[in-house]
Each structure stands twice: as C-alpha cells, then as structure tokens.
C-alpha cells in the first residue's frame, strides 16, 4: 500500500490525512525528519509560510526534504506549501526548498477577508473543482518544463513539474478528493518505477 506523508508542523494536517485515506492510500503525519523514509510521497500543507519555514529550520527538515526530492519522491505543496516548494518568491531573495520552477506571490488574492471559493477547470479532471482560497498565493510565472494545470481570472493557481505539484487553494477543505487523487496517482507512478 502507498503511504503518503503530510508535513505535520502546522496547517490542515488532519484534513489532508482524511483526503489521502479517502483515495485509498495510507496517511502519515510527519513530525520528525527520519519519518520521511517511511513515506512514498509528501504533502506540504497550507498554513503560514514564514512560520512553516521557521519550524522546518527548527526541526532540521530542510536538508532531509531536499534529499527526499532528490530520490525522485513526489511532493505536493498547497497554499503556503506551494510557497515552500517554489523556486522563487516575488519580493524575496530567500526561497525555501526551491524545487518547483515557478515564481509565486504571497497573499496575492488579499488578506483573510478575501477568502473565497471558485469553480476551477483543472487539467486531468472532467468536471470543475471547487477551490477554497484562504490568503492564497498565486503563480506569477511558470518556468521551463512546468505544466499549468489551472488558472483563475488569468492567474495560475495549479501547476506541475515532474514529481512536483503545487496549488494556491486548499483541496483538503472540500469533500471532493480529485486533486488529492491526482497526487496519489503521481506517487503510484513513482513507486511502480522505483520497483522496476
């Protein structure tokens, strides 16, 4: 059985675990770097990106996360997790993991009061998906080899590059688990290749 981890430092961790399990995989809350060895893929959940970065540093996750990526294991960043995954952050010369070849802008849809839901057309899904946006970032620029999966009002809100998936919204806050399912399928594909 596939095991997918959720970085459990902050954010909607339980909801992600519920979504993973609803897709037929096992979910594990990752609170220590050595637990990364137990999972086939990892979700970096929403929350607050600067707080998350501080916790990543405090619990010495930065290098283990980079090693995890270097092994080819899939990673999915949602909301603040997208910022952690991104190669570049607008207005900052200090990216976090720098893995997904995109430029992101923080809080680009406004402050908390500007939380909203929107029906999104997402590549790979037949029907629209309701995206829940909370102080969401968006992707200003998608670099080479990045596939844009969804846009909202001309702004990129989901993208994929190889083993990395990122989105501006919170897919775990709805009972529609199709976006999580896309990630589960990426992890399945990785695991099958790893077994060959």
Curated annotation (Swiss-Prot):
It comes from Bacillus subtilis (strain 168). Changing residue 48 to A: No activity, disturbing interaction with PdxS. GO terms for cellular component: cytosol; glutaminase complex. One of its GO terms (molecular function) is glutaminase activity. GO terms for biological process: glutamine catabolic process; pyridoxal phosphate biosynthetic process; pyridoxine metabolic process. This is Pyridoxal 5'-phosphate synthase subunit PdxT. In the presence of PdxS, forms a dodecamer of heterodimers. Only shows activity in the heterodimer. The lineage of its organism: Bacteria, Bacillati, Bacillota, Bacilli, Bacillales. The keyword Lyase applies.
């Amino acid at each position: 059985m596939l095991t997918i981890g959720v970085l459990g430092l902050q954010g909607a961790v339980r909801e992600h675990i519920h979504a993973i399990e609803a897709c037929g995989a096992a979910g594990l809350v990752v609170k220590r770097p050595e637990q990364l060895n137990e999972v086939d893929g990892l979700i970096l959940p929403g929350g607050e990106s600067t707080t998350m970065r501080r916790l990543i540093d405090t619990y010495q996750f930065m290098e283990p996360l980079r090693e995890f990526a270097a092994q080819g294991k899939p990673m999915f960043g949602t909301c603040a997790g997208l910022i952690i995954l991104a190669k570049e952050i607008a207005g900052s010369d200090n990216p976090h993991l720098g893995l997904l070849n995109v430029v992101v802008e923080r809080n680009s849809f406004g402050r908390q009061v500007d939380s909203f839901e929107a029906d999104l057309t997402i590549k790979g899904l037949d029907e629209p998906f309701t995206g829940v946006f909370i102080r969401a970032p968006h992707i200003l620029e998608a670099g080479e080899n990045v596939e844009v999966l969804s846009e909202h009002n001309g702004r990129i809100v989901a993208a994929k590059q190889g083993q990395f998936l990122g989105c501006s919204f919170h897919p775990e806050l709805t009972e529609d688990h199709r976006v999580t399912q896309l990630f589960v399928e990426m992890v399945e594909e990785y695991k099958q290749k790893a077994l060959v």
